[in-house]
Swiss-Prot record:
Function field: Part of a complex that catalyzes the reversible reduction of CoM-S-S-CoB to the thiol-coenzymes H-S-CoM (coenzyme M) and H-S-CoB (coenzyme B). HdrE may be responsible for anchoring the complex to the membrane. Electrons probably transfer from phenazine to the high potential 4Fe cluster in HdrD subunit, then to the low potential heme in HdrE subunit and finally to CoM-S-S-CoB.
Chief site of localization: membrane
Catalytic activity, reaction form: methanophenazine + coenzyme B + coenzyme M = dihydromethanophenazine + coenzyme M-coenzyme B heterodisulfide
Organism expressing this protein natively: Methanosarcina thermophila (strain ATCC 43570 / DSM 1825 / OCM 12 / VKM B-1830 / TM-1)
Name assigned to this protein: Dihydromethanophenazine:CoB--CoM heterodisulfide reductase subunit E
Gene: hdrE
Length: 264
């Protein structure tokens, strides 16, 4: 296997993880995610109306039935007369989150930073994967995966900091804004802490490897296990864990907004 197809992650410098091994880990995370989504859609299809709520007694849900019903609601005319065009909902309500902006400017900034950072980093990872896969199956590209990874380093840093700022705002709000602090439970802190850990571990892994900013004088030999730790917890909490936690709201809220035509 070429040098470009060996990752920074590994148990040690001599035991680096390979593309195939990373794809196996990714596939496991995706299977766990899909299984959780099927269970969640079945619950929604049988009448469950919120996170951690069970279906109506005696009803067996169907993910396909739920999706058909949801699509029918999306495409039919709103009976309440408040329906907005789908494109407007996608851009203003889902992408730019104007509903949150109407309620709180600081909360909106926090959500936008976390959303933009998280989703862009996810998209950049997808781009990196597509280049590596293309290279692996033998399709010629005008650049190597290693070159492409270096090109992505700056946007990865930029959107990593965007995500970090958003998470720090979330932490500050829960510490110093009384109504937010009083409404927070330990589970909310765990979810924020997980995103913070994923973000910081990424900076640390890169800093130890490059010796820039985030290395904190740590031994460079720690770079592979640090990168492996970041990769594993990213797959676990940013993909696999979503349907089993309150992270599901990043899927549930857009679905509800589209089904309600932007209505409350």
């Amino acid at each position: 296997m070429s040098e470009e197809m060996v990752y920074f992650s590994g148990l040690s410098d001599a035991l680096r993880i390979t593309f195939v091994q990373m794809m196996i880990l990714s596939a496991i995370a995706i299977v766990i995610f899909l299984y959780g989504m099927i269970i969640t859609l079945q619950k929604w299809g049988s009448g469950a109306t919120g996170y951690a709520l069970e279906p109506q007694e005696g009803k067996r849900g169907s993910a396909i039935t739920f999706l058909k019903t949801w699509w029918k609601q999306v495409t039919e005319k709103s009976p309440h007369g408040h329906g907005k065009p789908i494109l407007e909902i996608l851009i203003l309500d889902i992408l730019f989150q104007r509903r949150i902006l109407k309620r709180s400017g600081l909360r909106w900034v926090m959500h936008i930073l976390i959303f933009a950072g998280w989703m862009t980093l996810f998209a950049l990872s997808g781009l990196m994967f597509s280049v590596e896969l293309t290279h692996m199956i033998g399709i010629e590209l005008p650049f190597t995966p290693h070159m492409f990874r270096e090109w992505l380093s700056i946007p990865n840093y930029i959107f990593g900091y965007i995500l970090l700022i958003g998470v720090l705002i979330a932490i500050v709000r829960r510490l110093f804004v009384s109504e937010v602090r009083e409404a927070s439970i330990m589970y909310d802190w765990v979810l924020i802490g997980v995103v913070f850990l994923v973000t910081i571990s990424g900076f640390l892994a890169d800093g130890i490897r490059t010796g820039l900013i985030w290395d904190f004088g740590l031994d460079p030999s720690l770079a592979p296990p640090a990168a492996l730790f970041h990769s594993v917890i990213s797959l676990l909490f940013c993909i696999a864990f979503i349907p089993y936690s309150k992270y599901i709201h990043i899927i549930a809220i857009p679905l509800a907004l589209l089904a309600n035509k932007g209505g409350e």
